[in-house]
Swiss-Prot record:
Enzyme Commission designation: 3.2.1.84
Subunit organization: Heterodimer of a catalytic alpha subunit (PSL5) and a beta subunit (PSL4).
Free-text disruption phenotype from the record: No visible phenotype under normal growth conditions (permissive temperature of 21 degrees Celsius), but mutant plants have a temperature-sensitive phenotype (when transferred to 30 degrees Celsius) showing radially swollen roots and reduction in cellulose production.
UniProt keyword annotation of rRNA processing present: no
This protein's encoding gene: PSL5
Signal peptide start and end residues: 1-20
SUPFAM superfamilies associated with the record: (Trans)glycosidases, Galactose mutarotase-like, Glycosyl hydrolase domain
InterPro entries listed in its UniProt record: Gal_mutarotase_sf_dom (IPR011013), Glyco_hydro_31_C (IPR048395), Glyco_hydro_31_N_dom (IPR025887), Glyco_hydro_31_TIM (IPR000322), Glyco_hydro_b (IPR013780), Glycoside_hydrolase_SF (IPR017853)
Transmembrane segments: none
Lineage, top ranks: Eukaryota, Viridiplantae, Streptophyta, Embryophyta, Tracheophyta
Identification of the protein by name: Probable glucan 1,3-alpha-glucosidase
This protein's pathway: Glycan metabolism; N-glycan metabolism
Tissue expression from the record: Expressed in roots, rosette leaves, leaf blades, mature stems, cauline leaves, flower buds, flowers and siliques.
GO molecular function terms noted in the UniProt entry: carbohydrate binding; glucan 1,3-alpha-glucosidase activity; glucosidase activity
Enzymatic reactions: Hydrolysis of terminal (1->3)-alpha-D-glucosidic links in (1->3)-alpha-D-glucans
């Protein structure tokens, strides 16, 4: 009876939580002691100075010492160890930790497995330290080389670290502790009478190691706005959180949480944490700062005048944004990125944490999901309805109800008795299936996974050393300890066909609830004093738990296919490095217009901070979207990197054919737009895989000196060639669209030309949202509609050539087999297209050893903005003429009913993998 009452109380809790986000369930800064302590500090409070500077193993190494000698028998300030390392491409790494030679009570946790191994190969071994006395200082500062244009300065007294330009007025780029807010709570030994416990609501945190927080200020120079530090449902340009005129005086929180129906325009933390901030200013220069730390973090963006008596004397032409970073535990392990261009900063960050995994082609198509498709018959009917309504899709998803009692790696034998046959029927059409696998394991002695994990000692422990027992979807649950490489390898092995009975090569994985979510835990997550392998407290690794779970699952799918095929794993929790293992989505959003709008700054922020493969649930997870909202969401979502429809089980069914013929047509057109542009998207995913530059980008990344773009988060770039403006208000049939730059833009719907550098008011009919191709670009497409992306493999390409004022354009196309890792061994096609002086040329960008070939042809070449009236085109080396026609613009099977006539070269007969030219006569 007692257990039944507990179950009923948890059911009540879950249902109440699902109704709305309850702010009181989660801590504010004032309810978080380390944050409250740090925020009370005043500028100049730091009492540390730098001493004993030397070069050791190519690094600048020094001690941080108390400025005044320790007095009395109170807490003694012990020296800290500082090390500064320099890397190629303008990266500085600063680490500060306890002095291990003084035998601190324990070793602070340093996050492993995030910095890629190749990064250390870029280290510049410092040979010497120069000295310089800064005006007003009583002791010299240490100066080291960073690159030909930059140097790092370690100021001794007062303690400060910054990177500056070498030339001119030696402009600062990024600095740490310029305002003297640095504080490092040193580990101590508990003595009689000490009470280190903390309480929140009904939960008590034993805090066995006591206070150990770190805080410091970071300043960005020549800065108009700062961006990044996801995950929050806020504007793209981060608003100040402290100082004059601030309405919401709450820091941006980084603490992975299971948040239902989250608020928009809130600094409270969501499902992921990436402590990477990017600054951009009027000069067009960009810089960045990254703190590698997995403990809870709180970050203030300080408003101008946050402390009128502090600050650095700067010329009036300079602007600066100050920020304040606070963490509960860990060490200082920070990275300064000098830029100076926007893409330089994201590349520098990617060189530390890695670039995005190259997805399989199917993963870039449309995904259909619901909690839950109830049985095999339901799956078959949904699949057939897509075909009946001529709507392509690539993946059908199954949520938790497909399992045997929420036991992962199992199937409900009544509802899904033939899982392999079900998957094979989808695979026959080129489609895949995804099933959910969460980190909470049902505590059932008859469940093979729980039995094995218990016997092997693979669960996270509670503070007493017993297997942690929390509550989640299956009821009483334990959680796999993903911090251990041994356990991660074991977990990966669960995805083998032998262990995951009923799985096939077309089955992929969804990791949800991996913050981790614990329904009866503090803030719906795991207690901070739970223990991981090696005695690491959960507070130290919390934000990385989902990252390790994602990693282990992805590695498991690679092992399953013996390293041949790329994995696909969707994760809700995120952390630096997540991009190496798969896609993410923005969690449990709501069927509201504001949630549609906020999806854009959320996805832009994720892309800027390395997570290039992201999306939001189309239509909102909670609630029932009105047809107009759902249509507009599909129209925007067709340009998300990750494109998935999903809904809660209490919502009405919302497959695209359930809202009347007209709305079905509109949603089908939006999905067709995505499939038409798949060659362009896939090329952009390859760019992200190589460089780290995101697929979906803020306007200022392409137009860094255009101030009108700096806070624009309702429009976005897809690559460098497309600009998309969403419609975010009910009943809207017009939109104001700012088109940056000096060149023209071409409407994707009809080819109409708009000048750059101004705002245009234009129609936004129900058929589509405003979208434009930038003059000077060439975009590859496929215009034949198929059931799935794999059925498009042999279809011909269309090249859309958007000419600029010089009658020139260029673009790229990347092709591989769409599924394997053979591209790493040179099996791919990479072409560059250039139109100049009336000639379109295709040249090879792949290395000479690249060996993939293709029989696919270029079927159409569409020229937008061609100034003359040509009569024919000459194709070389075939030495043949191609047909030319003037007419309306075609987008897939759609033909513009009005607009500018465009020139189309039909059937030039050239192969996509060969060199050729097409000359306009």
């Amino acid at each position: 009876m007692r257990s039944l009452l507990f179950v009923l109380s948890l059911i009540c809790f879950c249902s109440q939580t699902a109704l709305s986000w309850k702010k009181e369930e989660f801590r504010s800064c004032d309810q978080t002691p380390f944050c409250k302590r740090a925020r009370s500090r005043t500028p100049g409070a730091c009492s540390l100075i730098v001493g004993d500077v030397s070069i050791t193993d190519g690094d600048l190494v020094a001690k941080l010492l108390p400025k005044a000698p320790n007095q009395g028998d109170g807490d003694q300030i012990k020296p800290l160890i500082l090390s500064l390392s320099v890397y190629k491409d303008g990266i500085v790494r600063l680490k500060i930790d306890e002095d291990h030679s003084l035998n601190p009570p324990k070793k602070r946790f340093q996050v492993p497995d995030v910095v890629v191994s190749e990064f250390e190969e870029k280290k510049i071994w410092l040979q010497k330290v120069a000295t310089e006395t800064i005006s007003g200082d009583t002791s010299p500062s240490s100066v080291v080389y960073v690159s030909d244009g930059y140097e790092a300065v370690v100021r001794h007294d007062p303690f400060e670290v910054y990177v500056r330009e070498k030339s001119g007025d030696r402009r600062r780029v990024v600095s740490l502790n310029s305002h003297g807010l640095f504080d490092f709570e040193q580990l101590g030994r508990k003595t009689e009478g000490d009470n280190w416990e903390e309480k929140f609501r009904t939960h008590t945190d034993s805090r066995p190691s006591g206070p150990q927080s770190i805080s410091f200020d970071v300043s960005f120079y020549d800065s108009s706005f700062v961006y990044g530090i996801p995950e929050h449902a806020t504007s793209f340009a981060l608003k100040p959180t402290k100082g004059p005129g601030v309405e919401e005086s709450e820091p941006y929180r980084l603490f992975n949480l299971d948040v239902f129906e989250y608020d928009h325009e809130s600094p409270f933390g969501l499902y992921g944490s990436i402590p990477f901030m990017v600054s951009h200013g009027k000069s067009g220069k960009t810089s960045g700062f990254f703190w590698l730390n997995a403990a809870e973090m709180q970050i203030d963006v300080l408003a101008n005048g946050w402390d009128a008596e502090s600050g650095i004397s700067l010329p009036s032409s300079h602007s600066r944004i100050d920020t304040f970073w606070m963490s509960e535990a860990g060490i200082v392990d920070t990275f300064f990125f000098v830029g100076p261009e926007p893409k330089d900063v994201v590349k520098q960050y990617a060189s530390v944490t890695g670039t995005s995994a190259m997805p399989q082609l199917f993963a870039t198509g449309y995904h259909q999901c619901r909690w839950n498709y109830k049985d095999e018959e339901d799956v078959a009917q949904v699949d057939s309805k897509f075909d009946e309504h001529d709507i392509p899709y690539d993946v059908l998803w199954l949520d938790i109800e497909h399992t045997d009692g929420k036991r992962y790696f199992t199937w409900d034998s009544v509802l899904f008795p033939h899982p392999e046959e079900m998957q094979k029927k989808l695979a026959a059409k080129g489609r895949k299936m995804v099933t959910i696998v969460d980190p909470h394991i049902k505590r059932d002695d008859s469940y093979f996974l729980h039995k094995e994990a218990t016997q092997m000692g693979y669960y996270v422990k509670d503070s007493s050393g017993k297997d942690f027992d929390g509550w989640c979807w299956p009821g009483s649950s334990s959680y796999i300890d993903m911090l251990s490489p041994e356990i991660r390898k074991w977990w990966g092995g669960r995805f083998s066909y032998k262990n995951y009975v009923g799985s096939t090569p077309s089955l992929y994985t969804w990791n949800d609830m991996n913050e981790p979510s614990v329904f009866n835990g503090p803030e719906v997550t795991m207690p901070r004093d739970a223990l991981h392998v090696g005695g690491v407290e959960h507070r130290e690794v919390h934000n990385a738990y989902g990252y390790y779970f994602h990693m282990a699952t992805s590695d498991g799918l690679v092992m399953r296919e013996e390293g041949k095929d790329r994995p696909f794993v969707l994760s809700r929790a995120i952390f630096p490095g997540t991009q190496r293992y798969g896609a993410i989505w923005t969690g449990d959003n709501t069927a509201e217009w504001e949630h549609l709008r906020v999806s854009i700054p959320m996805i832009l922020t994720l892309g800027l901070t390395g997570i290039t493969f992201s999306g939001a649930d189309i239509g909102g997870f909670f609630g029932n979207p009105e047809p107009e909202l759902l249509v507009r969401w599909y129209q925007v979502g067709a340009y998300y990197p990750f494109f998935r429809g999903h809904a809660h089980h209490d919502t009405k069914r919302r497959e695209p054919w359930l809202f009347g013929e007209r709305n079905t047509e509109l949603m089908r057109d939006a999905i067709h737009t995505r499939y038409t542009l798949l060659p362009y998207f896939y090329t952009l995913f390859r760019e992200a895989n190589v460089t780290g530059v995101p697929v979906v980008r803020p306007l200022w990344m392409e137009f860094p000196q255009d101030e009108a773009t700096f806070s624009n988060d309702e429009a976005f770039m897809v690559g460098s060639g497309l600009l998309v403006q969403g419609v975010y208000t009910k009943g809207t049939t017009q939109a104001s669209v700012y088109l940056p730059g000096k060149e023209s833009w071409y409407d994707l719907r009809n080819g109409k030309t708009y000048v750059g550098g101004k705002t245009h008011k234009m129609d936004a009919p129900e058929e589509s949202i405003p979208a434009f191709q930038k003059a000077g670009t060439i975009i590859p497409r496929k215009d034949r509609f198929r059931r799935s992306s794999s059925q498009m493999d042999n279809d011909p390409y269309t090249l859309v050539v958007a000419l600029n004022s010089s009658q020139e354009a260029e673009g790229e196309l990347y092709i591989d087999d769409g599924k394997s890792f053979e591209f790493r061994r040179g099996s791919y096609i990479h072409r560059r297209f250039v139109f100049s002086k009336g000639v379109l040329t295709s040249t090879n960008l792949a290395p000479p050893e690249a060996r993939l070939s293709s029989q696919c042809l270029i079927d159409r070449i569409i020229l937008l903005g061609h100034s003359s009236g040509p009569k024919s085109a000459l194709v070389e080396p075939l030495n043949q003429k191609a047909e030319i026609e003037m007419g309306p613009l075609r987008m897939g099977g759609l033909v513009a009913s009005s607009g500018t006539k465009v020139l189309t070269i039909r059937k030039p007969g050239v192969r996509v993998d060969q060199d050729w030219t097409v000359k306009i006569l």
